[in-house]
Amino acid sequence: MTATAPNTAQQLKYIKDSIKTIPDYPKAGILFRDVTSLLEDPLAYAASIELLTERYLDKGVTKVVGTEARGFLFGAPVALSLGVGFVPVRKPGKLPRATISESYELEYGTDKLEIHTDSIKPGDKVLVIDDLLATGGTIEATVKLIRKLGGEVTDAAFVINLPDLGGEARLNDQGITCYSLVDFSGH
């Protein structure tokens, strides 16, 4: 990107081009979209934070929730840019205060996420952010945690969406509007 302010289409192309695709990782037949290559490029990283922030500037967001671990890398800077608090959702045993948990399905088995019970107040308008939307299971569990605490969540934002895996439709069924900066076809 140049020193002059790029337009949104240029920023989105730059972001997409900064994400490396690794074939056959973590197993044969998978095309892994590596967001860490975006993080290595300060212009791409800054553009992603800027575009995610712009989308929610006037939406009345009071908290941003990020899912472990790469959701922290995008959620925290967006929260800071919006002037609101950031709340981490983590794997079990990683948060020091009282928590509630929610189980969710994985390809083989189940996993669990936790959130501090005092981190979301009734009526908080919460934006959920993660790096990538695939099947939507992690975000669906995160939304359930927020709603258990009385938070209002209607939006989730991602850097990458893998639309072929159905996560957006799954979240739409839960009343969640999804926004992603870039889409990649295939698994």
Curated annotation (Swiss-Prot):
Write out the annotated subcellular location.
Cytoplasm
Read off the PANTHER family from this record: ADENINE PHOSPHORIBOSYLTRANSFERASE, PHOSPHORIBOSYLTRANSFERASE DOMAIN-CONTAINING PROTEIN
Task performed by this protein: Catalyzes a salvage reaction resulting in the formation of AMP, that is energically less costly than de novo synthesis.
Which portions of this protein are annotated as coiled-coil regions?
A: none
Annotated HAMAP family: Aden_phosphoribosyltr
Which top EC class applies here? Answer: transferase
Annotated NCBIfam families: apt, PRK02304.1-1, PRK02304.1-2, PRK02304.1-3, PRK02304.1-5
Top-rank taxon of the source lineage equals: Bacteria
Q: Does the keyword DNA damage apply?
A: no
Spell out the protein name for this chain. Answer: Adenine phosphoribosyltransferase
InterPro entries, sorted: Ade_phspho_trans, Adenine_PRTase, PRibTrfase_dom, PRTase-like
* Natural source organism: Yersinia enterocolitica serotype O:8 / biotype 1B (strain NCTC 13174 / 8081)
The record lists the catalysed reaction(s) as: AMP + diphosphate = 5-phospho-alpha-D-ribose 1-diphosphate + adenine
Assigned protein family:
Belongs to the purine/pyrimidine phosphoribosyltransferase family.
Q: What is its EC number?
A: 2.4.2.7
User: What cystine linkages occur within this chain?
Assistant: none
- What is a GO molecular function of this protein? adenine phosphoribosyltransferase activity
User: What subunit structure does UniProt give?
Assistant: Homodimer.
Q: Name one Pfam family in it.
A: Pribosyltran
Give the record's keywords alphabetically: Cytoplasm, Glycosyltransferase, Purine salvage, Transferase
Q: Name one GO cellular component term.
A: cytosol
Q: In which pathway does it act?
A: Purine metabolism; AMP biosynthesis via salvage pathway; AMP from adenine: step 1/1
For biological process, the GO terms are:
adenine salvage; AMP salvage; purine ribonucleoside salvage
